[in-house]
Amino acid sequence: MTMSFCALLFFLIISPTLAATKSAADYYVRSLPGAPEGPLLKMHAGHIEVDAPNNGNLFFWHYQNRHIANRQRTVIWLNGGPGCSSMDGALMEIGPYRLKDNHTLEYNNGSWDEFANLLFVDQPVGTGFSYVNTNSYLHELDEMAAQFIIFLEKWFQLFPEYERDDIYIAGESYAGQHIPYIAKAIQERNKKVDDKNSARWNLRGLVIGNGWISPAQQYPSYLNFAYTEGLVKEGSSLAKDLDVYQSVCESKISAAPNAVNIKDCESVLQQILSRTMDSERKCYNMYDVRLRDVYPSCGMNWPSDLVSVKPYLQSRDVVRALNINPDKKSGWEECSGAVGSTFTAANSVPSVQLLPELLESGVRILLFSGDKDLICNHIGTEQLINNMKWNGGIGFETSPGVWAPRRHWTFEGEPAGIYQYARNLTYVLFYNASHMVPYDLPRQSRDMLDRFMRVDIANIGGQPADSRIDGEKLPQTSVGGHPNSTAAEQQAKEKIKETEWKAYAKSGEAALIVVIIGVTVWGFFIWRSRRRNRGYEGVYQKELGSGSILERFQNKRSGAGDVEAGDFDESELDTLHSPGLERENYAVGDDSDEDDPNHPRPTASSREDGTHP
């Protein structure tokens, strides 16, 4: 009797710990509402705690690559803001799916998961599906990078089979600040690691699209871009008025050259948008000047896919499928005004100052721009390159006074843009593209990525794209539909039975789970009730249209109310309910014999278990 009671008491004490300790299986996405017919792509999603005292958790959504080319690669994708969700990238840009409507997904022809594992992360804490107590939002870029290292350490503990992949960090807009800081933090972490006990992470490259990297070059470019695109006529009375604002901006930059945000410079963009409205009070879309929008939104209602993304991600079925923690009490919002207004980076230097050392350390960097974006336009990016010194030269110098040529890129017979390269830095200008290049040109953007990662498809097959620079046909990359090739399709079929049973295993410990299942369920309810008591308060945010352009950007589409404390709208979630489709789960391209021999993939069973957007 006493022994039985003691045993029960022991299990009750340790059960919360067992329940709180997660494995890869707890993150496995077994079904995804609205997914296309056929086997479901291999994916994991959920939260990882990065700040226990303040209930800080980052949300991730991971897709395993469809095919392995010559080596294993992982691309980490971040959107900007700060405070804008990387689900923008997942569902509107580079992810394998896009939304046809509020309930239905379709394949994205040109998704970046063809030859790379994709890891989307909502960060900093409080962004998208991530959460934290509202008095604990981050302020500085080094704080953000430190938390991201904590996230990666824990993520690789859950998924050790990816830890020796070649790592590329990609993103757009304000992620142009985040990415170099994270890269520097990874290098600092690697210096302290004993490779015998913990792996050094193979950081290979950074990919930044329409990046907010160098405010000192980006702010003055607004007016030059307006002249170049014909939004404002040079020498006109409007141009003279705007010159006054430009002069104030330039003086502020001279006084504070290391500032990340300068409100007086944002007035230039505000004036361009407000003073170029048409007779219907429609302003230019700051993300794509080929379009117009109602004032003062000026692009906040873009892109059109957003009308489906928000209700889809707020659907109960999707929230359940993506393993969202009960602690996340508010529905998904694209951008958090609370996060953006707190993340001032007042004591941080612009990330452009980190680029030379990263380039000189051997990290390759790709900067790309859509030519129709105003807010983070290509003129500013080109100016930062021209003024930057690294690896013994300035800008795209190949030798003193000689600059690398701007080479013309064609894709499937059509002009696609410009390529330029020197000393580990590549620049690509996309023609007829917006702030979100992969949204407009998914296949061209994937072609760019594959070339930058030096993908070799010799062992894969498939139909390569006709991609040329200055008329010279480039090495073959395949950017066709899904599956990539008949060989890969056959390989997938052979893998189905092998991997199906593993989808529900838990790090090879299924038998143990059966034994302790009853105890852990009991412990889960105890743990859950404790965690729920660690809630957080809300912070009221400004209405759209108030404040500076960047403040509006950070408050973008986050709703008129509080984004961090607002409960789910029960009736809305019921209306948006879409039946979850149970699908066959499988992975493509697991064979270790296709890996780089210098980067063997561990056989850990856990892999199979489970301001600017």
Curated annotation (Swiss-Prot):
Residues 528-613 are cytoplasmic. It comes from the Eukaryota. The chain crosses the membrane at residues 507-527. The active site is at S173, D373, H435. Residues 463-490, 559-613 are annotated as: Disordered. Residues 1-19 form the signal peptide. One of its GO terms (biological process) is proteolysis. GO terms for cellular component: membrane; trans-Golgi network. Residues 20-506 are lumenal. Glycans are attached at N102, N109, N424, N432, N484. Its main location: Golgi. Pfam families: Peptidase_S10. SUPFAM superfamilies: alpha/beta-Hydrolases (SSF53474). Protease with a carboxypeptidase B-like function involved in the C-terminal processing of the lysine and arginine residues from protein precursors. Promotes cell fusion and is involved in the programmed cell death. This is Pheromone-processing carboxypeptidase kex1. It comes from Aspergillus clavatus (strain ATCC 1007 / CBS 513.65 / DSM 816 / NCTC 3887 / NRRL 1 / QM 1276 / 107).
